[in-house]
């Protein structure tokens, strides 16, 4: 009798233990499903937050656009007026710039013509002097020179260069007329170079000229000017 009761109690305990294990397994399964569901909920919440932020941004942009669209008419008129004034100012400056460019071109052309005329005048004057020198030194024998002595002169320059005569070291045989002619050519060449240098200096700003200190020193100060006037 006691053995039967003992066996019956053991069977009941076994059934209860199996039922407990089944319940625990089901609880674990439901817990795993619950964890997955919570993860999905968090993901959806994140998506909802992103959509909400995007909606707020779009709403703000829409409000700004509506505000600009509803700009007062007076403000529009003022903006249009400012645009017209700016356009007129730009056109005025463009006209002034075009006028200045035209004026500069005219001045450059005038300077070029003046320089060309003066250069041509100097060349013509130099050519006349060279012609005169050839008349004095070329052709027959020169006074108090024999034909052989005159033949010692040789031309070593090109056609467009100043005349130059070479007789070695016999300088005392050169006639006075020839020396004067040579000095005249040299003087004209130096004058031409000097004029060109002066023109270059005049084209520069006064502060950039080589002789600016000389120009300043040549100008009288206030005391000297008062003395000269009295």
Curated annotation (Swiss-Prot):
Region called Disordered, residue ranges: 63-90, 194-230
Bias type Basic and acidic residues, positions: 194-217
Record's protein name: Uncharacterized protein B0286.1
Annotated source species: Caenorhabditis elegans
